[in-house]
Swiss-Prot record:
It catalyses: a plastoquinone + NADH + (n+1) H(+)(in) = a plastoquinol + NAD(+) + n H(+)(out); a plastoquinone + NADPH + (n+1) H(+)(in) = a plastoquinol + NADP(+) + n H(+)(out). Transmembrane segments: none annotated. This is NAD(P)H-quinone oxidoreductase subunit I, chloroplastic. NDH shuttles electrons from NAD(P)H:plastoquinone, via FMN and iron-sulfur (Fe-S) centers, to quinones in the photosynthetic chain and possibly in a chloroplast respiratory chain. The immediate electron acceptor for the enzyme in this species is believed to be plastoquinone. Couples the redox reaction to proton translocation, and thus conserves the redox energy in a proton gradient. NDH is composed of at least 16 different subunits, 5 of which are encoded in the nucleus. Its cofactor is [4Fe-4S] cluster. It is found in: Plastid, Chloroplast thylakoid membrane. The keyword Metal-binding applies. [4Fe-4S] cluster 1 binds at C64, C67, C70, C114. It comes from Eatonella nivea (White false tickhead). Residues 55-84, 95-124 form the 4Fe-4S ferredoxin-type domain. It is a peripheral membrane protein. Belongs to the complex I 23 kDa subunit family. The gene is ndhI. The lineage of its organism: Eukaryota, Viridiplantae, Streptophyta, Embryophyta, Tracheophyta. Pfam families: Fer4_9 (PF13187).
Amino acid sequence: MFPMVTEFMNYGQQTVRAARYIGQGFMITLSHANRLPVTIQYPYEKLITSERFRGRIHFEFDKCIACEVCVRVCPIDLPVVDWKLETNIRKKRLLNYSIDFGICIFCGNCVEYCPTNCLSMTEEYELSTYDRHELNYNQIALGRLPMSIIDDYTIRTVLNLPEIKT
């Protein structure tokens, strides 16, 4: 009879321990109930990107001197710069400039090392297409400034997203 009593006591202790673990999990669940949601409703709400966000590259054709520094500092030699040497003035004339965003890793080296500041990073991050050949932007497409998230009246911007504590 003595082993049966100890087994019953062990069973009771295990039951109490299991109830305590369930209670701890339930308390954690309840503590998260009064927090704000971390996710946003993406197409209808957008986060305002930070100042240093590295989005699509903007190119100013008039400022470019075709020095090809952007090509040399790019880890994957991505920008394609076509130029012609003007012999009478002994300067390069830019003919075509293009970047394939399907290959670009958005490192920002081209923007950082450009001597004339003709390249800049924008806040545009919606570059998805059904055809990857549409991601090859020429100087005309690179010259378009994106519509600012703040100016877009069709979406609601989320300014204060709660910080995630780890």
